[in-house]
């Protein structure tokens, strides 16, 4: 069984939560819970409220995601 491709969407960080989790509002108005990807943790990339980010969502659970890029 082939793994389905993740969905990439743009959003803005609303609030930081414990354990490197963030509440992100997507461009379409939906709010998701997102965590930082491993590479971003390794390179100590800081994410603050108001930052524009790219979020990767699983097609199986559209309420949770992974932050994969922070736009300047």
Curated annotation (Swiss-Prot):
<dbReference type="GO" id="GO:0003743">
    <property type="term" value="F:translation initiation factor activity"/>
</dbReference>
<dbReference type="InterPro" id="IPR006196">
    <property type="entry name" value="RNA-binding_domain_S1_IF1"/>
</dbReference>
<dbReference type="InterPro" id="IPR003029">
    <property type="entry name" value="S1_domain"/>
</dbReference>
<dbReference type="GO" id="GO:0019843">
    <property type="term" value="F:rRNA binding"/>
</dbReference>
<dbReference type="Pfam" id="PF01176">
    <property type="entry name" value="eIF-1a"/>
</dbReference>
<comment type="function">
    <text>One of the essential components for the initiation of protein synthesis. Stabilizes the binding of IF-2 and IF-3 on the 30S subunit to which N-formylmethionyl-tRNA(fMet) subsequently binds. Helps modulate mRNA selection, yielding the 30S pre-initiation complex (PIC). Upon addition of the 50S ribosomal subunit IF-1, IF-2 and IF-3 are released leaving the mature 70S translation initiation complex.</text>
</comment>
<keyword id="KW-0396">Initiation factor</keyword>
<keyword id="KW-0699">rRNA-binding</keyword>
<dbReference type="InterPro" id="IPR004368">
    <property type="entry name" value="TIF_IF1"/>
</dbReference>
<comment type="subunit">
    <text>Component of the 30S ribosomal translation pre-initiation complex which assembles on the 30S ribosome in the order IF-2 and IF-3, IF-1 and N-formylmethionyl-tRNA(fMet); mRNA recruitment can occur at any time during PIC assembly.</text>
</comment>
<dbReference type="InterPro" id="IPR012340">
    <property type="entry name" value="NA-bd_OB-fold"/>
</dbReference>
<dbReference type="GO" id="GO:0005829">
    <property type="term" value="C:cytosol"/>
</dbReference>
<protein>
    <recommendedName>
        <fullName>Translation initiation factor IF-1</fullName>
    </recommendedName>
</protein>
<dbReference type="GO" id="GO:0043022">
    <property type="term" value="F:ribosome binding"/>
</dbReference>
<keyword id="KW-0963">Cytoplasm</keyword>
<comment type="similarity">
    <text>Belongs to the IF-1 family.</text>
</comment>
<keyword id="KW-0648">Protein biosynthesis</keyword>
<feature type="domain" description="S1-like">
    <location>
        <begin position="1"/>
        <end position="72"/>
    </location>
</feature>
<keyword id="KW-0694">RNA-binding</keyword>
């Amino acid at each position: 069984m082939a793994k389905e491709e993740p969905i990439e969407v743009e959003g803005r960080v609303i609030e930081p939560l414990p354990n490197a989790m963030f509440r992100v509002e997507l461009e379409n108005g939906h709010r998701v819970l997102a965590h930082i990807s491993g590479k971003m943790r390794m390179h100590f990339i800081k994410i603050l409220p108001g930052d524009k980010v790219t979020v990767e969502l699983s097609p199986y659970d559209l309420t949770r995601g992974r932050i994969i890029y922070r736009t300047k």
